[in-house]
Regions:
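Flexible glycine/acidic-rich beta-alpha junction loops that bind and position SAM and/or redox cofactors
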Residues: 92-96, 170-189, 224-239
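Single-residue recognition of alpha-helix boundary sites
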Residues: 27, 146, 186-188, 237, ...
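A structural signal for short, well-ordered beta-strand segments and their strand-loop junctions
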Residues: 61, 85-87, 173-175, 223-225, ...
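Alpha-helix termini
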Residues: 122, 152, 179, 188-190, ...
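Active-site-proximal beta-alpha core segment in soluble small-molecule metabolic enzymes
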Residues: 1-171, 178-184, 195-200, 208
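Charged (often Lys/Glu-rich) extended helix/loop segments that serve as interaction or gating elements
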Residues: 196, 204-206, 210-521
Length: 521
């Protein structure tokens, strides 16, 4: 962001004290802006004001009234004229998942009454000329441009009113909200898309503020956006290997049932053997009834395990054939709509959903996902993706489709002789920083790649976290763990439970794993 944004004089926003420490150090261009949001204490404000005193263009945005009083106090102590911004709580709100981030229910911002109180306070403290910026935020990933335009109109009147009151505001920070078209629909009907382009967003933002300024004879403001999602989402791709698959059992076409097979098996075999389009609904109902009866008999010890397994294989074979027939029909019975989801394979993949795609788990965010090899082959399987955590929530079962949401991903059958990789796109916003170490899976390996006219360059390779690093985060000292194991192994050797060579091999494997990758290798 810093290197590529330098020619655009790109500024940075800090939403907390730790972020401010990072921003001050990396934003070396003294002419670019630093906007300070979030809750602030005296040390946060002092750090910002001292950085301003040394030449940084820092704006302290007041989120709550008490912050303004702290800014006035610290500015007087440090003998500096602060650049003050005020976050205004608009009545307008966004649309989509984060609609409640704006409007009257917003966590941050001053109401109209609080704004007047703040203006009176600044005037009484001789800080009237220090109010340089107003800010609003109506939520992330705003799906409808109409909501953005409504908020802009409302905010523009605050700009006009403040100028009329003698507060010469220079900047209007229109916050975040610029959305990303994750699912490709370019529609406000989906929370994973938006019904506008970046150009339309820019046109509306500028024209609204320019028009209202011209009508009231006041200067055009400098417009700031905090479009972090739109700026970063496209830069990152998550790639992982499929380790193995699991499919539902099926009956071998060449297999014939034994004459003494259980009557339920014989009945279900007859349904499978005579299945056709005309009889498929009746066959489906009969198959379900037989399966339920067989499971009940098994639970009471009347049917043995072999019979249960035969029932399962026949039942799922019938389900597959019915689904194949139904998919070819224009108007298939409603009962068959969920069969494709039910029949999907499970592809177990070398990643943690909670570490690398937390939004997929937490808010059902849908990302573009596809295999990245064998693209000249038609996929022959349908699958959901399972991660390697021990949590049943660690799966992706919703995918982008040309028709609403698909509950499986078209994939290829695995080949024993070659790996199979799947990629998840548009993961550059929020996913890495929100990642959770569920089951102690850490950060993944990362590669920084730049694209040019001749192709691409690998700029940097960053190793993922080791087991030792992750254990250290949760207060397990790796060296102490090794010492504990050494004591235990020595005791086991002395007691004759293992040989000396076996003990050495165990410790070698333990140390190697401790300082190795948290994912499967």
């Amino acid at each position: 962001i810093i290197s590529h944004g330098k020619k655009f004089n790109l500024g940075l926003e800090a939403g907390s004290k730790p972020e401010l420490h990072a921003v001050i150090a990396v934003n070396t261009d003294s002419d670019s802006l630093i906007v300070c949001n979030g809750y602030k204490d005296e040390s946060y404000i002092e750090l910002a004001l001292l950085a301003q005193k040394m030449g940084k263009r820092i704006f302290l945005v007041v989120e709550k009234m008490n912050e303004l009083k702290l800014i006035a106090k610290m500015a007087k102590q440090l003998n500096v004229q602060p650049n003050i911004g005020i976050r205004i709580k608009l009545a307008s709100s966004g649309s989509g998942k984060w609609e409640e981030s704006g409007g009257d229910a917003s966590k941050f911002g001053l109401t109209s009454s609080e704004l007047l109180e703040a203006l009176d306070f600044m005037e009484s403290k001789g800080l009237k000329d220090c109010l340089k910026l107003i800010h609003f935020h109506i939520g992330s990933q705003v799906t409808k441009i109409r909501r953005i335009k409504t908020a802009l109109r409302e905010a523009s009147q605050f700009y006009v009113q403040l100028h009329a009151m003698g507060f010469k505001v220079e900047f209007v920070d229109i916050g975040g909200g610029l959305g990303v078209d994750y699912d490709g629909t370019r529609s406000s009907n989906s929370e994973g898309s938006v019904n506008y382009s970046i150009q339309e967003y820019v046109n509306d933002s500028i024209s609204t503020l320019v028009d209202v300024s011209d009508k009231n004879g006041i200067p055009h403001p400098n417009i700031i956006t905090e479009s972090g999602r739109a700026l970063t989402a496209h830069h990152s791709v998550l790639i992982f290997e499929v380790l193995e698959t699991a499919t539902l059992p099926e009956w071998d076409d060449e297999e014939v049932i034994a004459p003494d097979a259980h009557e339920l098996v014989q009945e279900l075999y007859g349904i499978w053997d005579s299945l056709n389009q005309n009889k498929m609904l009746e066959a489906w109902h009969d198959a379900q009834q037989i399966r339920e009866e067989a499971l009940d008999l098994f639970s009471h010890g009347i049917v043995d395990l072999k019979t249960r397994a035969q029932i399962e294989r026949l039942y799922w074979s019938i389900t597959r054939e019915i689904n194949q027939i139904a998919e070819g029909l224009k108007h298939a019975p409603d009962e068959f709509r969920g069969l494709s989801k039910l029949l999907a394979d499970k592809y177990f993949c070398n990643f943690s959903l909670f570490q690398s795609l937390p939004d997929s788990w937490a808010i059902d965010q849908i990302f573009p996902i596809m295999p990245i090899q064998r693209l000249d082959e038609k996929p022959d399987r349908s699958a959901t993706l399972q991660d390697i955590t021990c949590d049943s929530d660690g799966k992706i079962a919703n995918f982008i489709s040309t028709r609403n949401v698909a509950h499986y991903l078209p994939v290829h059958s695995l080949k024993k002789t070659e790996p199979y990789y799947v990629a998840v796109f548009l993961v550059g916003a929020y996913q890495e920083i929100l990642g959770d170490m569920h089951n102690l899976f850490g950060d993944t390996n990362a590669v920084h790649v730049s694209v040019n006219e001749k192709g691409y360059n690998i700029e940097q390779i960053i190793d993922g976290e080791t087991v030792a690093e992750v254990l250290d985060y949760v207060q397990y000292n790796p060296k102490k763990l090794v010492r504990t194991l050494e004591t235990w192994v020595t005791k086991s050797v002395k007691e004759g439970k293992i040989s000396l060579e076996e003990g050495k091999e165990f410790l070698s494997n333990y140390r190697s794993g401790l300082y190795g990758y948290t994912y499967l290798e």
